[in-house]
C-alpha cells in the first residue's frame, strides 16, 4: 500500500512538473487591439487577423476591438464590431480567444478614463487590463488602430501599463513625417499623444510617409500585394473561405460558420478574381498591407531571398546562402505634438521608443509578393 501511495505521489509530482513546464512553451503572449469590423471597414484588418491565429510562435491571449462610432454607419454601410471574423477564426483553430469592444468616442482630454461609456464598451478595457494582470509572463500588445483603448487603460492603471507586465507595445500608426496626419492617429489625436508620451516600451511601425499611406519609405511598413488569385488555390479550403468571406464582405450570408465548411460558390470565386483595392483608393495594387512587419517582429520571422525567391522564415532557419532583407529597430527620441503628429531622431543611448526601418522598401515589396502567398498557404486550421 505504501508503495502504491508513493507511486501515486510521484505521478502527481510528474504531472505537476509537466504542467508547470507547459506554461512557458516559448510562445509570445499577445493582446491584439484592432479596429476590426464586420463588414470590414478596411479588409486588411480581417485578412491580417489570420496571422496571429496561425503562427505557432504566438499565444493570442485577447482581442480588443477599437471601434470608432462614425464607422459603424458610413456611406450607407452598417457595421458592427468584428465579432464575426473573431468567431470564425476561433472556430477554425479550435480556440476561444476572448474579445470585447472598447469605447467608441474620442477622448475629451488626454486624461480621459471613459468611465461614462456604456457597459458594453467598458468590456474591452476590462479585458485588456485583466489579461495583462493575469498573464504568466510579460505580454506584447499589438495596436493596429487608434491608440484610444491603450490611452484609456493607461489612464486607469498607469501602474500596470508601465510595469514589467508589458513587454513591448507594437504600434502600427502614424507617419514617418511630421507633415502628414495618418489615419490611425487622426482617429483619436489626444489618445495618440497620451500613449506616445507615456514612457511605455514602444516599437513604432508608421503606416505612412509625407506622401501618404500608400507610399513606401524606409521608416514605414506599407506594401502592396499585386495578386489575390492565390487565395483560391490555398490547400486549406476553410481558410480560403474565411479570406473570401471577409474580403468580399459577405453580409448577404449570415451563416458565417457554415460558409467556411461548404464549397466556395463560383460567383464568389469570380468576385475575388475581380476584386481590386485600387478601385477604392486609386494607387495600384489589389490589396494593401501595413501589418506584416509587426507580426514578423513579434514572431521573430525574417524575409529572405532564397534561390532568387522571397520567403518568410523563422530567424533560426535562415540558411547560409539566404539573402536577408534588412530590417532594424532604431532607438529614437520622439517629440510628440498635441495633435498626435511626431518627429523622431535616431539616438545611440537607451530609449523607450524604437522605430521600424527597412533598407530597401521596393525590393522588400517584391520579395513579399513572392513570400506572402506561400506563407499564408502554409497555414492550417484545426479539425
Task: Label each region the model flagged.
Residues 2-9:
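Sec-dependent signal peptide recognition
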Residues 19-20, 93:
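Long, soluble alpha-helical segments
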Residues 100, 170, 296:
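Residues in well-ordered beta-strands of folded domains
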